Amino acid sequence: MRKRFLGAMLLALGISLFGGWGSAQANSVPEPTQSMLHVCWLKDSHVNPAACEVVRMPEAFEPAKAVVTSSVDFPDFQVVALDLREVTEEGYPIFNVQSIYYKDFLRATEPIIIVMRDSESFPRNGIAVRDSLGRERIFGIAISGEDGSLLLSEVDR
């Protein structure tokens, strides 16, 4: 119990200090990849759900439906399950990442709906894409504590 509490405190400290879920975001030069990806609640989107592919996470919470869109085509798109593995001494969370769904490309014209797992204080749902330099980038889908909207935040494996 005490270990869990300390881990949660370190996680909160890392988030508040670095503004993200992982050191990848805090230590890398920002690249437009994250700004080209968008996530929002299905109820807040302007997409026709009947025209979208739907991916269900294991242990999905039916009302928690997110829409992922992009302004460009991204290769090697994945929907991933995130599980907190550890929090480093510096307060960075490290996640186990399991691919749930793979698609050759996330196309700008083809939004995807994700029926997500229930989230707690850290993201349990995410996406991965390959950026313009060929690197895999993993983003957790988190709920904003300010307005309840969805946010993408880069995470470490």
Region annotations inferred by a language model:
Residues 25-29, 34:
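Boundary of Sec targeting at the N-terminus
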Residues 44-85:
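Short, surface-exposed binding/anchoring microloops in extracellular/periplasmic proteins
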Residues 100-133:
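Short, solvent-exposed, Trp/other aromatic-anchored flexible loops in extracytoplasmic proteins
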Residues 92-106, 142:
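Solvent-exposed serine/threonine-rich low-complexity stretches and specific carbohydrate-binding patches
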Residues 79-97:
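Short, surface-exposed beta-strand/strand-loop-strand elements in extracellular ectodomains
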Residues 9-19:
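Bacterial N-terminal signal peptides
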Residues 123-153:
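Terminal connector regions
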Residues 1-9:
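Bacterial N-terminal signal peptides that target proteins for export
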